[in-house]
């Protein structure tokens, strides 16, 4: 049985008019009758395309400032009518079949994102007729084609030309899926917006506050790739991304070469890239199992890589390397000659570096593009039966935010190192301890249940690599509940500590620092990472 359906009549009504004139012209040239509404109809007519206004077709005018345009039985009957089953009733009521619906919706997201948008503005950008037509056409995809995305226009025309002006059921079904995804996303945005409104009907009264967290949490992600497996080989997995991510990230990165990214590759690459974004100077971050094992700055990325690698060459094997500058030939050569690496990611990659890395055909090389500022958004964590939602941790301190609480003031060099290792500690799993000196990590202690043991591990790692802890700065992602961590740090040779403060025993901890002649800096900001 031939499941192709010819396109003889199309209804076109779009808010985003990208490519619509060319698409409508192509349909008209193929003998398709075009129905349209409002601004779309005027635009097509101005371009010399023959078009019938929906109001002329239905005999019912647009009204209520355009709120009622397509909500009419002659429109929805033409879209929903089942060919071969409803033909008689359609003919009885003068309803012509509509074979294609081309609709995208009022720009609700763009409207509410504008500064000064009122609830009234938002309400007037809630599309009613559009989603109704989209859902009607998608429901009746057995007979009707629905097109909601401009990037599908060329695909439709190409298939019509190859298939006697018809489209297959497979194509109609695929376009119907896109349509339901489109309306689901649209309704989710509206629900999120209204879900953050204060009880006083959108009018802020004294004492009212808007919540940034809606009553229901609606977000839509598009599947970018299926994976061989997840975190472990017995777990199925896929990678989903935001529809239009604004910030350079692992989600937006272009893979230049190498094997397909695994679940763990993506998680680790995200950790490495987000950490390296914290630095303005040329920087390198090496990550293993989502923890930085080496971070350093340099006069160029080759020097930064060399110094980051020295922190923990053992853990760097099979790791992820991220840079905040273009990957050049010299750095690519140093990496490929020195170590096995799973992924390299950088804002850009030189042509010479691409050629060098090509010799390691399995190495995954990613180019993510430049970034300027970080976008706001939510972090989510799945728990059994629920979802934890919070702001992204974009908190960071400057020198002006720091409070020196010890008798000894930090030197200028210690202060610089303190700010450096504080940035690193933010990306180390709690309990996190970082030793650093000269804009280079010396030891990293991650993920221990006891903060003092994280400090011990940082010292052990430094000793294993022959790195000198004496004179280092220590960063802790959270406060020290007891003085034992400070005593252990002093014994290891730490001269300056940066930490949030806020413990019930802060006075005891500060006393310990003073006893050991250490400088201690409070940030007033914690960076737990679980």
Curated annotation (Swiss-Prot):
**What cellular-component terms does GO give this entry?**
cytosol
Instruction: Please provide the record's keywords in A-Z order.
Output: Hydrolase, Multifunctional enzyme, Purine biosynthesis, Transferase
Q: Which GO terms describe its molecular function?
A: IMP cyclohydrolase activity; phosphoribosylaminoimidazolecarboxamide formyltransferase activity
Q: Which PROSITE patterns match?
A: MGS
The residue ranges of the MGS-like domain are 1-148
Specify whether NAD is a keyword of the entry: no
BP-aspect Gene Ontology terms: 'de novo' IMP biosynthetic process
What EC identifiers does the entry list?
2.1.2.3, 3.5.4.10
Q: Which reaction does it catalyse?
A: (6R)-10-formyltetrahydrofolate + 5-amino-1-(5-phospho-beta-D-ribosyl)imidazole-4-carboxamide = 5-formamido-1-(5-phospho-D-ribosyl)imidazole-4-carboxamide + (6S)-5,6,7,8-tetrahydrofolate; IMP + H2O = 5-formamido-1-(5-phospho-D-ribosyl)imidazole-4-carboxamide
Which Pfam family, any one of them, does this sequence belong to? Answer: MGS
Question: Gene3D superfamilies of this UniProt entry?
Answer: 3.40.140.20, Methylglyoxal synthase-like domain
Describe which pathway this protein belongs to, using the record's wording. Purine metabolism; IMP biosynthesis via de novo pathway; 5-formamido-1-(5-phospho-D-ribosyl)imidazole-4-carboxamide from 5-amino-1-(5-phospho-D-ribosyl)imidazole-4-carboxamide (10-formyl THF route): step 1/1; Purine metabolism; IMP biosynthesis via de novo pathway; IMP from 5-formamido-1-(5-phospho-D-ribosyl)imidazole-4-carboxamide: step 1/1
Superkingdom: Bacteria
Q: What is known of its domains?
A: The IMP cyclohydrolase activity resides in the N-terminal region.
**Into which family does the record put it?**
Belongs to the PurH family.
Per its record, how is this protein called by name? Bifunctional purine biosynthesis protein PurH
Q: Which organism is it from?
A: Aliivibrio fischeri (strain MJ11) (Vibrio fischeri)
């Amino acid at each position: 049985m031939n499941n192709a359906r010819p396109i003889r009549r199309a209804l076109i009504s779009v808010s985003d008019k990208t490519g619509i004139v060319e698409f409508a012209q192509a349909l008209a040239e193929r003998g398709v009758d075009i129905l349209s509404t409002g601004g779309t109809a005027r635009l097509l007519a101005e371009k010399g395309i023959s078009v019938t206004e929906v109001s002329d077709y239905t005999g019912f005018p647009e009204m209520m400032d355009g709120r009622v345009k397509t909500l009419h039985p002659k429109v929805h009957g033409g879209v929903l009518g089942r060919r071969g089953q409803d033909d008689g009733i359609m003919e009885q009521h003068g309803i012509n079949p509509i074979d294609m619906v081309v609709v995208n919706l009022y720009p609700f997201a763009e409207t509410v994102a504008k500064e000064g948008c009122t609830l009234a503005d938002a309400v007037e950008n809630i599309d009613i007729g559009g989603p109704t037509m989209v859902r009607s056409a998608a429901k009746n995809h057995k007979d009707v084609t629905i097109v909601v995305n401009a990037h599908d226009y060329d695909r439709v025309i190409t298939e019509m030309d190859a298939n006697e002006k018809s489209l297959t059921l497979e194509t109609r079904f695929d376009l119907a899926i896109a349509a339901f995804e489109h309306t689901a996303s649209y309704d989710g945005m509206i629900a999120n917006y209204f879900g953050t409104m204060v009880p006083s009907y959108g009018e802020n009264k004294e004492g009212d506050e808007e919540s940034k967290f809606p009553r229901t949490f609606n977000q839509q992600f598009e599947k970018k790739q299926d994976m061989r497996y997840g975190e472990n080989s017995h777990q199925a997995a896929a990678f989903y991304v935001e529809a239009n991510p604004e910030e350079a990230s692992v989600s937006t990165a272009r893979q230049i070469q190498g094997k397909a990214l695994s679940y763990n590759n993506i998680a680790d690459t995200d950790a490495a890239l987000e950490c390296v974004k914290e630095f303005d100077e040329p920087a390198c971050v090496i990550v293993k199992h989502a923890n930085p094992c080496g971070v350093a700055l340099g006069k160029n990325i080759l020097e930064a890589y060399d110094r980051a690698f020295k922190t923990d060459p053992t853990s760097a094997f099979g790791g992820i390397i991220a840079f905040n500058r273009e990957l050049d030939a010299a750095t690519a050569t140093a990496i490929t000659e020195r170590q096995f690496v799973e992924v390299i990611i950088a804002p850009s990659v030189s042509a010479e570096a691409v050629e060098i890395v090509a010799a390691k055909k399995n190495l995954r090389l990613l180019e993510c593009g430049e970034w300027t500022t970080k976008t706001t958004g939510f972090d989510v964590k799945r728990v059994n039966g629920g979802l934890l939602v919070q702001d992204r941790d974009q908190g960071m301190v400057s020198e002006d935010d720091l409070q020196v609480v010890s008798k000894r003031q930090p030197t200028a060099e210690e202060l610089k190192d303190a700010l450096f290792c504080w940035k690193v500690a933010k990306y180390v799993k709690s309990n996190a301890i970082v030793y650093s000196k000269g804009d280079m990590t010396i030891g990293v202690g991650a993920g221990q249940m006891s903060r003092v043991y994280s400090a011990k591990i940082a010292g052990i790692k430094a000793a294993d690599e022959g790195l000198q802890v004496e004179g280092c700065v220590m960063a802790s992602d959270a406060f020290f509940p007891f003085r034992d961590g400070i005593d252990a740090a002093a014994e290891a040779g730490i001269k300056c500590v940066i930490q949030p403060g806020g413990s019930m025993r802060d006075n005891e901890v500060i006393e310990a620092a003073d006893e050991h002649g250490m400088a201690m800096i409070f940030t007033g900001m914690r960076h737990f990472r679980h």
